[in-house]
């Protein structure tokens, strides 16, 4: 994948994340600045999602640790867990919120 394709795929994934948060009605503030999306929770904890251009990966950092995702067959798959990005992100958001979020 070239650089343009990578950015289009990441932008699309970040939009999916925003839509999932909005649809869930979750009390999560999010902001995207440059290559970084920050999710902030009531207790001040954060999840950071950023694109790593040289590696063509998306990285996620949370209080559980760091995760690297590669695009495989149209999905962003974690090299550590094998989970898809949105699946793992939802689990991490539940942990940060200290309660289950009603994901749609």
Swiss-Prot record:
GO terms for molecular function: ferric iron binding; ferrous iron binding. InterPro entries: CyaY, Frataxin/CyaY, Frataxin/CyaY_sf, Frataxin_CS. GO terms for biological process: iron-sulfur cluster assembly. Gene3D superfamilies: Frataxin/CyaY (3.30.920.10). One of its GO terms (cellular component) is cytosol. The keyword Metal-binding applies. CDD domains: Frataxin. Keywords: Iron, Metal-binding. Belongs to the frataxin family. Involved in iron-sulfur (Fe-S) cluster assembly. May act as a regulator of Fe-S biogenesis. This is Iron-sulfur cluster assembly protein CyaY. The lineage of its organism: Bacteria, Pseudomonadati, Pseudomonadota, Gammaproteobacteria, Vibrionales.
């Amino acid at each position: 994948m070239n650089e343009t394709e990578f950015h289009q795929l990441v932008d699309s994934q970040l939009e999916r994340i925003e839509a999932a948060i909005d649809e869930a009605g979750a009390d999560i503030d999010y902001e995207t600045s440059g290559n970084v999306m920050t999710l902030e929770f009531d207790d001040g904890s954060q999840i950071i999602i950023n694109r790593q251009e040289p590696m063509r990966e998306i990285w996620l950092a949370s209080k559980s640790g760091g995760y690297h995702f590669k695009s495989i067959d149209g999905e962003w798959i974690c090299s550590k867990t094998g989970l898809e990005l949105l699946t793992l992100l939802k689990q991490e958001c539940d942990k940060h919120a200290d309660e289950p979020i009603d994901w749609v």
